[in-house]
Amino acid sequence: MSTANALGDLLSTLLLRRPFKRGGSKEGSISKLCLSLLSEVTEVSGLQLAGVILEKYHELDEKGRLDFFSFLNKDLDIDPDLLVSLAQKYQETQSPEIFKRLSEASEPRRKELFRRLNHAPGATADLVKMREQLLSLLRENPSYARTDFDFIHLLRSWFNRGFLVLRQITWDTSASILEKIVEYEAVHEIKNLEDLRRRVLPKDRRCFAFFHPSMPDDPLIFVEVALTNGVATSIQKVLSESREEIDLQGANSAIFYSISNCQEGLSGISFGNSLIKQVAQDLSREMPHLKTFVTLSPIPGLTKWIKDEGLEKPVEDQGMLKQITAHYLVEAKGKNRRPIDPVAKFHLGNGAIIHQINIDADLSEKGLLQSKGVMVNYLYDLSKISQNVELFSKEGDNSANTTIKALSRQAGRNIMQKGNAKEFSQ
């Protein structure tokens, strides 16, 4: 890996906190303890109090957590009357002192509470878990989104790319981390240890993960890569138990066939963009003969869209299925002119283009249900990523090669001529 990653590993080691036993008095409600922490002026006593609060939080039942989040949301919110008053005074005076008070008043106190809680050993992982539990309550308690806004603002800062450490996952990686890889795999289930071995041990198979120094044994996101001769068109072949390992000198393509986010509490914070680009760059340096970097991606919204558009009959023909899939990926967009397919939205937004559509590429039960077995390759051209990101951001352009665009146009002509479907969603 690169020098930056080596330094990151060193940073990870240096930042590992010494064992610390959380202690101190647990007297008083958790809300009172939080108020005490906010008024604490000495770092040592604040550190212990933060640990006590996190311990107390772990002991809360469902009702206790609801009460705690209600306290954060209401009692530690901004004071709008004070804010308006200070804004008016600042407008009149432009006073630096008023500006300082206005800035302080505009930040909810819960934000400073999260910062102080994070001083305790192991607190970062605790706060990520806390946000995960908060997210589970948002549907029935939409006002808690105010607290979540502050949470995610801080987490984005704490988990910015500069703090992340890229590590390769191998068969020699610690058992605890390998167990988490099995647990977190979200795209293609790892069925047993032998299945895991086939994904990380052979020289033509790689797995890379981002870690954070405060959570050194728990991956944030990981990607699985197959090094192949030619673009892979089927997940069955990639994961085949009987496949033969290839000589790395004969590999010209890197296939990103699975990417899994690991922490629900970090939902909304994107690591995938940086991970794919970093891995592609590192592999390119290690093996200059690798010329093609593509994904082998699911199309989770395809079957539903086909049904909604009344296209079940036409897609019984495989040629039509390929055309209609191309049309879905290129033209099916939401009100914001972004793809309605979440995987397409992710990769196109990261600078990839739609490269190739593969029929019968995922014959698992999940693959057949969500996309009638179709998968797609998104191409990452390292020299054009920035250009593609800009086009997608400004124009919502669903970048695709000429073959895909031709398939999409043909789908429109065929279906409309036969009158077999509603007008395609645009």
Residue positions per predicted region:
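Extended, composition-driven regions rather than compact fold-specific motifs
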Residues: M1-Q426
